[in-house]
From Swiss-Prot:
Name listed for the protein in its UniProt record: Protoporphyrinogen oxidase 1, chloroplastic
EC code: 1.3.3.4
Tissue spec: Expressed at high levels in the leaves and at low levels in the roots and floral buds.
The gene coding this protein: PPOX1
Cofactor: FAD
Top EC class of this enzyme: oxidoreductase
Catalytic activity: protoporphyrinogen IX + 3 O2 = protoporphyrin IX + 3 H2O2
Domain of life: Eukaryota
Family per record: Belongs to the protoporphyrinogen/coproporphyrinogen oxidase family. Protoporphyrinogen oxidase subfamily.
Lineage: Eukaryota, Viridiplantae, Streptophyta, Embryophyta, Tracheophyta
Source organism: Arabidopsis thaliana (Mouse-ear cress)
PANTHER family for this protein: PROTOPORPHYRINOGEN OXIDASE (PTHR42923:SF3)
Function in brief: Catalyzes the 6-electron oxidation of protoporphyrinogen-IX to form protoporphyrin-IX.
Basic and acidic residues: bias regions: 256-268
């Protein structure tokens, strides 16, 4: 899910929700000789008496979603000597995880994440995947809206706009200004929720009218439970480093000025302003392009049923594949599946790590794509006769179920036929788990009913339903204590001797598609460092 309309710097990524294969097949132990501790080797052979095949490799990446694919790409492009022989295994018959792009009758829509922030790491992945010419960027001047008191109100895109927008009262703006300068209650000395941090630093209006809907758009979460440190760490660090949000901002600016500037890759595009990106044929182009480059290293319909530690070092992973049972022996393993899936797979290795990972929560979210004729848009919502903007967010206090709406056909070109408007709507989340009991028709009705309150003319014809995708376990919630849970899981694996077994994915790196890519580069560095040490053992 991705509705980061207030600042296009965080987009969320719907995680995979395939159920863990809790039935761990027990096979008779087999004595296998494998050059796991030596130089990089790869090969396959029949397992004598086992009726299957064994493969030896440097690194196995479990999960062919965007995190797993990007880790493989990062290793191949940035650390080619670390794990020259690697494989990416995916239980489904396609790559991409929750990136699902559909195209039909002149419409092109997303049923998972909708876009990404074009940061340099993201653009590096785009260029290395051969997609530079397919990149499309939204208009950085396009407005974003928040529903308040029955009206869609624009959100300021820069500080100089603050005095002039009507989403907040004069008193609310003054309270936010003083708080940002440090004239506010002191920190409580414990981990704060997003709600606690924002109300203390910026006041009630900023929280209720800006941050609460922002949390719904990014995490589909409850800001009274989300951790400020874990969910919005960059803002949290401003107060930590500078004594206040403004103080931290100036300090960060000064540090950037004094820091040595690395030369920017000349291959990368130069986006103008703060915007979001996609591709000519939708987000699916990225996982498909990476998979094509990896070729036979990507294994589809490979279901991991068990993982054990080898006495000689490394790991043995047992897979059920279309070609039968396969045993993979690898020096390192990266788990990029959702935390609840990883928990089931890792329980035989570490009860403590599995218990920690099982605590993470993923609420349900539905992505509802519908279309209206252009004339269905209310006149007061048009700019120069057109629906313009990124989209709109809906605070939970405003009497609508829908978390927010992306103006898909306004954001990127060629998303809808002439005369039609394409809207991607998200509904559900931590505060509305009841969507799981609703049919597709009921979800469309709920979204349509909400839109007629502020965007669509009440007497317009029924919308054209394009797609309804329900994600029962959608977005990992970075709740208070999230980092403690991750630390427990990682330290439990390390203390039990499971070196070279890494945790990755959006519950580790962050829910934004861009953060998954940045996290992939970070994980690739970890694997490279481990493999460098491994070579000298």
């Amino acid at each position: 899910m991705e509705l980061s309309l207030l600042r296009p710097t965080t987009q969320s990524l719907l995680p995979s929700f395939s159920k863990p294969n809790l039935r761990l097949n027990v096979y008779k132990p087999l004595r296998l000789r494998c050059s796991v501790a030596g130089g990089p080797t790869v090969g396959s052979s029949k397992i004598e008496g086992g009726g299957g095949t064994t493969i030896t490799t440097d690194c196995v990446i479990v999960g062919g979603g965007i995190s797993g694919l990007c880790i493989a790409q990062a290793l191949a492009t940035k650390h080619p000597d670390a794990a020259p022989n690697l494989i990416v295994t995916e239980a489904k018959d396609r790559v991409g995880g929750n990136i699902i792009t559909r195209e039909e009758n002149g419409f092109l829509w997303e049923e998972g994440p909708n876009s990404f922030q074009p940061s340099d790491p993201m653009l590096t992945m785009v260029v290395d995947s051969g997609l530079k010419d397919d990149l499309v960027l939204g208009d950085p001047t396009a407005p974003r809206f928040v529903l308040w008191n029955g009206k869609l109100r624009p959100v300021p895109s820069k500080l100089t706009d603050l005095p002039f927008f009507d989403l907040m009262s004069i008193g609310g703006k003054i309270r936010a200004g003083f708080g940002a300068l440090g004239i506010r209650p002191s920190p409580p000395g414990r981990e704060e929720s997003v709600e606690e941090f924002v109300r203390r630093n910026l006041g009630d209006e900023v929280f209720e009218r800006l941050i609460e809907p922002f949390c719904s758009g990014v995490y589909a979460g409850d800001p009274s439970k989300l951790s400020m440190k874990a969910a919005f760490g960059k803002v949290w660090k401003l107060e930590q480093n500078g004594g206040s949000i403004i103080g931290g901002t100036f300090k960060a600016i000064q540090e950037r000025k004094n820091a040595p500037k690395a030369e920017r890759d000349p291959r990368l595009p130069k986006p103008q302003g703060q915007t979001v990106g996609s591709f000519r044929k939708g987000l699916r182009m990225l996982p498909e392009a990476i998979s094509a480059r990896l070729g036979s290293k990507v294994k589809l319909s490979w279901k991991l049923s068990g993982i054990t530690k080898l006495e000689s070092g490394g790991y043995n992973l047992t897979y059920e594949t279309p070609d039968g049972l396969v045993s993979v022996q690898s020096k390192s393993v990266v788990m990029t599946v959702p935390s609840h899936v990883a928990s089931g797979l890792l329980r035989p290795l570490s009860e403590s790590a599995a218990n920690a990972l099982s605590k993470l929560y993923y609420p349900p979210v539905a992505a509802v794509s519908i279309s209206y004729p252009k004339e269905a848009i209310r006149t007061e919502c048009l700019i120069d006769g057109e629906l313009k903007g990124f989209g709109q967010l809906h605070p939970r206090t405003q009497g609508v179920e829908t978390l927010g709406t992306i103006y898909s056909s306004s954001l990127f070109p060629n998303r809808a036929p002439p005369g039609r408007i394409l809207l991607l709507n998200y509904i559900g989340g931590s505060t509305n788990t009841g969507i799981l009991s609703k049919s597709e028709g009921e979800l469309v009705e709920a979204v349509d009913r909400d839109l007629r309150k502020m965007l669509i003319k009440p007497n317009s014809t029924d919308p054209l339903k394009l797609g309804v995708r329900v994600w029962p376990q959608a977005i990992p919630q970075f709740l208070v204590g999230h980092f403690d849970i991750l630390d427990t899981a990682k330290s439990s694996l390390t203390s039990s001797g499971y070196e070279g077994l890494f945790l990755g994915g959006n519950y580790v790196a962050g829910v934004a598609l861009g953060r998954c890519v940045e996290g992939a580069y970070e994980t690739a560095i970890e694997v490279n460092n481990f493999m460098s040490r491994y070579a000298y053992k």
